[in-house]
């Protein structure tokens, strides 16, 4: 599965996040062509803290 791992503090108190990118049919795609994303925030031990669904525009910014 394609995703981007971002190391650093997250808004919900996590230590890192993973961003998974999807097209309009929820197929996992490269971030450059994504229209939707799921952002998962984790503690350093892998415990899931928060999961957020978002819509991305052509510049991959949350709408």
Q: What do these predicted ranges mean?
A:
Residues 1-63:
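Glycine/tyrosine- and acidic-biased, solvent-exposed loop/turn segments at the edges of beta-strands
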């Amino acid at each position: 599965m394609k995703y981007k791992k971002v190391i650093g503090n997250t808004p919900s108190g996590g230590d890192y996040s993973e961003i998974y990118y999807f097209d309009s049919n929820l197929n996992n795609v490269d971030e450059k062509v994504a229209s939707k994303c799921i952002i998962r925030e984790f503690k350093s031990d892998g415990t899931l803290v928060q999961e957020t669904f978002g819509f991305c525009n052509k510049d991959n910014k949350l709408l």
